[in-house]
Amino acid sequence: MMGKKDYSERSQVQIASLDDLVPSGHLVRKLEEAIDLSFIYDEVKDLYKHYGRESIDPVVLMKIVILQYVFGIPSMRKTIKEIEVNLAYRWYLGYGLYEDIPHFSTFGKNYTRRFKDTDLFQKIFSRILMEVDACGFLDTESLFIDGTHIKASANPHKYQNETMEKEARCYEKELLEEIEKDRLEHGKKPLKEKETTPETINKKVSTTDPDSGWFHKGEHKQVFAYAANTCCDKNNYVIDFEVTAGNVHDSVSFWELYRKVSERVKYPKYYVMDAGYKIPAIARTLIEEGKVPVMPYKRPMTKKGYFRKSDYVYDEYFDCYLCPNNQILKYSTTNRDGYREYKSDGKKCKDCPYQNQCTGSKDHVKVVSRHVWEGYMEKVEEIRHQTGMKEIYQKRKETIERVFADGKEKHGMRYTQYRGLAKVTMELTLLFACMNLKKLAIWKWRKGGLRNPCSFVWIFEPIYLYIKFKMVPGASHQEPFCLQSEQGMHCMSCFSI
């Protein structure tokens, strides 16, 4: 028989509390139970005056942002519109059915006038992470580091070319000391001091967002973007991150991220990273500090048809290289970049049968370079071949890459709607904090057991089964049905038969 809906219910007056209208298993209930946000009052009390009209509750402001990022709402304007019609969102904020929701510009004005130059968002991120750790959900034996690019809110056709000074490497001083030491051991004079004129490079600078960087996204696509180098644990909780322009290499932004992570996590064992971080300086730092760098095989950047560097065997005792034709390449010098140069005898190489596969130089001299910290890179290769390292590295796709995938697909991380490094950092701080909070809320909910109004059925299951099969005629042929389920689906939290 075809049924017809009576739409008079739309105008019926019913007595119900807002709490009754929000499903017991809704995510907002899990968020509310996961962490007490009242600590925000102590963090912002000095940012408000002691007189005048009462402001909007700062905890409510933060909860509005949490709703935006947790549910992946693209803008604050749309977030406010969703809150106006969504009973669960109103319940989470503590707003009644007829209470006016704050204007969409409220958070922006509060950020500009109060929160801009504070560490409030960083403290919220840290507090959530502390709660995760207190619940025992952090697994920091293996830390996974990687970078992703976030498209900037900038027109790729509006830019100007500028000449900038090349930034010095953060380990430049240590490297120069190692170079001088290496040259003295080989009987070479110290390098002359560099000219005072600094090195310069040409860059495309956006006129819309100068803090962003020109990023080559694939072979035919270039955009202005930001880079977020991020560290997470085995359970996908974000430990910390570092935001830079999109044209900054991962190995450059690693150092600030490593400093932050070292302050948060004291005794990690493995640092799992991709080939973008595989440089001698990073390998040296991790190994000397007792960490185990887990990095992949990196294909040698050799011209097609030429011997690879691995085809030249290094003799550590005599400090020389042997070529595929068993000729010796002797030490020549150590350059400013920290590479020892080993050169062959051009007279012997002139008639070598492998010359076309070895070198294309006019004087027939083959030069093989070796970094002064190359020994650490060899240790990284040894670690790569150890038992279990391959399995640890393969966890990247389930951890850090999953963090980026969820962030971009579910929480609006693919694009940034803000301009400037400070605002983008604020956005990512809140985004990662909300991702951690969402996972924390779900995990705590599961750890606490089933919390829904049907859960009491498990207590009375024997009575229910007796009535079903013994006292009600024909009941054994009826399938259990839960009125709270959607579209007549079976609710497994109510019945187990």
Regions found by a protein language model. Give the residues of each.
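Hydrophobic alpha-helical membrane-insertion signals
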Residues: 1-29
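Anion-binding and metal-coordination hotspots
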Residues: 4, 72-85, 95-497
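Generic alpha-helical segment signature
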Residues: 11, 24, 37, 57, ...
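A general alpha-helix detector
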Residues: 17, 43, 60-66, 106, ...
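Basic, short loop/linker segments at the boundary and entry of helix-turn-helix/winged-helix-like folds
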Residues: 24-66, 71
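A short secondary-structure junction motif
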Residues: 38-42, 86, 90, 410
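Short amphipathic helix-turn modules centered on a small-residue break
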Residues: 42-48, 90-97
